[in-house]
């Protein structure tokens, strides 16, 4: 079984942050792609960003990659920044930051490949 990290303190910090898109009141939104979660298992609480309720629903409806593409967001970069701002010292935050940085790079490569696939061929 994967080592899922739970942190009520970090989630409370995320819930106090404004939505990363609208700046309005946000709620904790877990990032499932490229994470340590699984089917019906939320990923670690450090794989989390703040989204307005309506946008959080939209993220689930569209699917994560489509949602993040629509808004030109790399969620792992944002999650990494939130971890550095959080006062949660339950775990080695440097390890979490390193993992999120690696996921951000991987997501960037995936995003570039998707963008390349959607461009029309040159004539």
What are these regions (language model features)?
Residues 1-25, 43, 49, 53, ...:
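Extended charged
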Residues 25-39:
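Short recognition patches in nucleic-acid-associated and regulatory proteins
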């Amino acid at each position: 079984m994967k080592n899922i990290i739970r942190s009520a303190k970090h989630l409370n910090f995320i819930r106090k942050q404004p939505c990363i898109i609208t700046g309005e009141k946000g709620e904790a939104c877990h990032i499932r792609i490229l994470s340590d979660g699984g089917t019906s298992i939320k990923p670690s609480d450090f794989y989390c960003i703040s989204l307005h309720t309506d946008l959080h629903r939209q993220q689930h409806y569209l699917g994560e990659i489509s949602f993040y593409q629509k808004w030109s967001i790399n969620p792992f970069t944002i999650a990494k920044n939130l971890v550095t701002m959080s006062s949660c010292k339950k775990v080695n935050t440097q390890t979490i930051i390193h993992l999120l940085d690696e996921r951000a790079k991987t997501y960037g490569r995936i995003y570039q490949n998707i963008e390349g696939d959607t461009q029309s061929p040159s004539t």
